[in-house]
């Protein structure tokens, strides 16, 4: 609701979320865009009305595994070729990887974790941090543009030779998977945690 511009109408939902989760040490989300919205926008929406404690505690699952737990071993095997999807929110609001428009030392926390998986081959597509076209309400308000962006992104993932597209943003994966299914594009989609958990 807030993402669609109805910020005042979403205040009660945000306050309820905060009350439910504020006492936990960490709030871990399986979607980078959802985690980013809580972290970046919840405090702005509630500014001067309610202290949003949960926004300081939420993180994407990749952040949690990489930065908090500091995972250095994964027991699983995944003998497949994957192309990593770096979502807009993950890159630019959560810092999961280095954005191409900034001249900083390259890093990618998603790839750091995937490199621990036995048998995996990892690629990134050309224009690796360009949007897939989902963008929440954007995909509803501009479906033709959203679909075309998704098609272009999928084709670039496929050009890597990947069997799977993986990443930490459920909404991006869902968007691209829907387009690929509708258009019979021969590539699969899997959340990064499903790969990391393959040996559990």
Residue spans for each PLM region:
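Iron-sulfur cluster-binding electron-transfer modules in prokaryotic oxidoreductases
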Residues: 1-200
């Amino acid at each position: 609701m807030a993402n669609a511009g109805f910020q005042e109408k979403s205040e009660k939902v945000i306050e309820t979320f905060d009350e439910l989760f504020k006492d936990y040490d960490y709030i871990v989300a399986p979607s980078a865009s959802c985690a980013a919205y809580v972290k970046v926008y919840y405090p702005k929406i509630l500014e001067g009305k309610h202290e949003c404690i949960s926004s300081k505690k939420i993180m994407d699952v990749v952040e949690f595994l990489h930065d908090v737990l500091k995972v250095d071993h994964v027991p699983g095997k995944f003998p497949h070729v994957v192309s990593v999807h770096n979502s807009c929110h993950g890159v630019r609001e959560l810092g999961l990887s280095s954005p191409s428009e900034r001249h900083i030392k390259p890093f990618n926390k998603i790839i750091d974790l995937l490199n621990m998986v036995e048998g995996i081959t990892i690629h990134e597509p050309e224009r690796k941090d360009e949007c897939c076209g989902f963008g929440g309400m954007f995909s509803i308000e501009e479906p033709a543009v959203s679909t075309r962006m998704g098609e272009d992104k999928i084709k670039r993932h496929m050009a890597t030779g990947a069997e799977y597209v993986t990443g930490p943003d459920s909404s991006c994966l869902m968007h691209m998977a829907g387009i690929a299914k509708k258009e019979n594009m021969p590539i699969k989609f899997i959340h990064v945690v499903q790969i990391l958990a393959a040996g559990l």
